[in-house]
A protein has these predicted regions:
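Short, polar/charged alpha-helical segment
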Residues: 1-8, 124-128
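Beta-alpha junction/loop-to-helix N-cap segments that form part of ligand/metal-binding clefts
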Residues: 4-76, 141-148, 170-173
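Loop/turn elements at helix/coil->beta-strand transitions in domains of secreted/extracellular proteins
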Residues: 9-12, 37-41, 60-64, 78-81, ...
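Extracellular/periplasmic Venus flytrap/periplasmic-binding protein
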Residues: 28, 72-74, 80-183, 219-227
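Periplasmic-binding protein-like
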Residues: 33-46, 66-68, 109-112, 159-169, ...
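Extracellular/periplasmic periplasmic-binding protein-like sensory domains
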Residues: 176-250, 307, 313-314
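Segments of small-molecule ligand-sensing domains
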Residues: 235-247, 257-313
Length: 315
């Protein structure tokens, strides 16, 4: 964008601060970005937890808070300055539950974190299955906790027909490896939150057969936005293959710069916020977002993909 003269004739400056995956640090960084750096938009916070202390600050300042990497309720039910480019976790969970219950699964076990977001994910499953007179079993774990053989035994004692995993790649991969090591087979689906490529790398051969929801096109597809983002990242010096997280970030960046281009006052936070609110339907190149006053969540796109034996994600 800057190579073409910027947005509205003004170059875009990207200021990046490391939050070390810590909520308090993310909140402190937000204050610095809003005060010392006079940010006109906050972009790409890595989770709902890291967004919790940042969103109220953005709301108070009237600054756009755009494209957090989360579909959790705290982000979906956030202040009016918060806009997303991805489907909600509820959308993802309903997609996988419709698939498995349609195949006759009765005992659904939800693996979730024992925090606010994890409990909300469990609640979505409870509400969905209530319509079918079913009740899921819950298996909660602490964030950053290591799973051992006793944890796995507790999980398997729940006798799952299917495991719905809402945790990150580390524990999700450990569960898959434990299942395979014991000669068992339990159908498993993970939220996009797992990080598909990170999970596949961590689980190795044990990832085969696991399904993962995707909220952006497959990074190996021929969608124009995939080609465009892969080229942009290569030109930026990235050597590893583009994954779903990279693609989601790139889509977010394209939508954000389009709103900047349409803003009536380039470089003005409130003008940018108004441009985003009135962006309407925007096709990024095979991935469509749609915003309007009162409609801050641009997409409900969800696909269910499966990991093949060669470690590829297949739709």
């Amino acid at each position: 964008v800057n190579a073409r003269g910027g947005a509205g004739g003004k170059p875009i400056e990207l200021v990046t601060l490391d939050d070390a995956n810590d909520r308090k640090t993310a909140g402190a960084n937000t204050q610095k970005l809003l005060t010392a750096n006079n940010a006109v938009a906050l972009f790409g916070y890595a989770s709902a937890t890291l967004s919790l202390d940042a969103m109220p600050q953005a709301d108070k300042a009237g600054v756009l808070f755009f494209a957090p990497f989360s579909g959790a309720n705290p982000v979906r039910q956030a202040p009016p300055v918060v806009f997303t480019v991805r489907a909600s976790y509820a959308d993802e969970l309903e997609k996988m539950l419709a698939f498995w219950t349609g195949l006759g699964a009765k005992q659904v076990v939800v693996v979730h974190y024992d925090d606010e977001v994890g409990k909300q994910n469990l609640a979505v499953v409870v509400e969905y299955l209530k319509k079918q007179a079913k009740t899921p079993a819950a298996f909660s774990i602490a964030r950053n906790a290591k799973l051992d053989a006793s944890n796995f035994a507790q999980l398997m004692a729940l006798k799952p027909d299917v495991i719905i995993s809402t945790v990150l790649s580390g524990p999700a991969a450990e569960i898959s490896k434990q299942i395979v090591a014991r000669g068992s087979f339990v159908p498993t689906s993970s939220l996009s939150f797992v990080g598909a490529q990170q999970y596949i790398a961590a689980a190795g051969e044990a990832a085969a057969g696991v399904s993962i929801t995707q909220v952006v096109p497959n990074p190996s597809s021929r969608a124009p936005i995939v080609t465009e983002c892969a080229k942009a990242m290569q030109e930026a010096g990235m050597t590893q293959p583009m994954n779903s997280t990279h693609l989601e970030a790139c889509i977010g960046a394209k939508v954000l710069t389009e709103a900047m281009r349409r803003a009536k006052k380039p470089g003005d936070a409130r003008s940018l916020l108004a441009a985003m609110q009135n962006l309407g339907r925007y096709d990024t190149g095979g991935f469509v977002v749609n915003y309007a006053p009162g409609q801050n969540h641009g997409s409900k796109f969800v696909e269910l993909a499966m990991v093949s034996r060669d470690g590829k994600l297949r739709n």
